Amino acid sequence: MENLNMDLLYIAAAMMMGLAAIGASIGIGILGGKFLEGAARQPDLIPVLRTQFFIVMGLVDAIPMIAVGLGLYVMFAVAG
């Protein structure tokens, strides 16, 4: 029974990291598309849009990095 619990912890950690990567890629893809759309509509605002784009992209990318850290913690500290 203990092996089953360990296997479930590994599966949970892998799903956590995988879903975080999928969510980040979808979020950054949508964000990049909206940035290009805004730059095409208002070329004069590209510097402002670029600054806001990188700030929001960093925030969108921070959550999956936290999930990857938690997933690795579960894999190596809790399950290992």
Swiss-Prot record:
The record's Gene Ontology cellular component field reads: plasma membrane; proton-transporting ATP synthase complex; proton-transporting two-sector ATPase complex, proton-transporting domain
Kindly state which keywords UniProt assigns to this record, in alphabetical order. ATP synthesis, Cell inner membrane, Cell membrane, CF(0), Hydrogen ion transport, Ion transport, Lipid-binding, Membrane, Transmembrane, Transmembrane helix, Transport
Enumerate the transmembrane spans: 11-31, 53-73
Keyword Cytoplasm assigned: no
Site feature location: Reversibly protonated during proton transport: 61
Looking up InterPro entries in the UniProt record yields: ATP_synth_csu_bac/chlpt, ATP_synth_F0_csu, ATP_synth_F0_csu_DDCD_BS, ATP_synth_F0_csu_sf, ATPase_proteolipid_c-like_dom, F/V-ATP_Csub_sf
Instruction: Provide the primary localization.
Output: membrane
The Gene Ontology terms for molecular function here are: lipid binding; proton-transporting ATP synthase activity, rotational mechanism
Q: Where in the cell is it found?
A: Cell inner membrane
The record's annotation in PROSITE patterns points to: ATPASE_C
A Pfam family hit: ATP-synt_C
Q: What is the membrane topology listed in the Swiss-Prot or TrEMBL record?
A: Multi-pass membrane protein
Q: Subunit composition? A: F-type ATPases have 2 components, F(1) - the catalytic core - and F(0) - the membrane proton channel. F(1) has five subunits: alpha(3), beta(3), gamma(1), delta(1), epsilon(1). F(0) has three main subunits: a(1), b(2) and c(10-14). The alpha and beta chains form an alternating ring which encloses part of the gamma chain. F(1) is attached to F(0) by a central stalk formed by the gamma and epsilon chains, while a peripheral stalk is formed by the delta and b chains.
What function does this protein fulfil?
A: F(1)F(0) ATP synthase produces ATP from ADP in the presence of a proton or sodium gradient. F-type ATPases consist of two structural domains, F(1) containing the extramembraneous catalytic core and F(0) containing the membrane proton channel, linked together by a central stalk and a peripheral stalk. During catalysis, ATP synthesis in the catalytic domain of F(1) is coupled via a rotary mechanism of the central stalk subunits to proton translocation. Key component of the F(0) channel; it plays a direct role in translocation across the membrane. A homomeric c-ring of between 10-14 subunits forms the central stalk rotor element with the F(1) delta and epsilon subunits.
Q: Which family does this protein fall into? A: Belongs to the ATPase C chain family.
Listed name of the protein: ATP synthase subunit c
- Protein species of origin: Aeromonas hydrophila subsp. hydrophila (strain ATCC 7966 / DSM 30187 / BCRC 13018 / CCUG 14551 / JCM 1027 / KCTC 2358 / NCIMB 9240 / NCTC 8049)
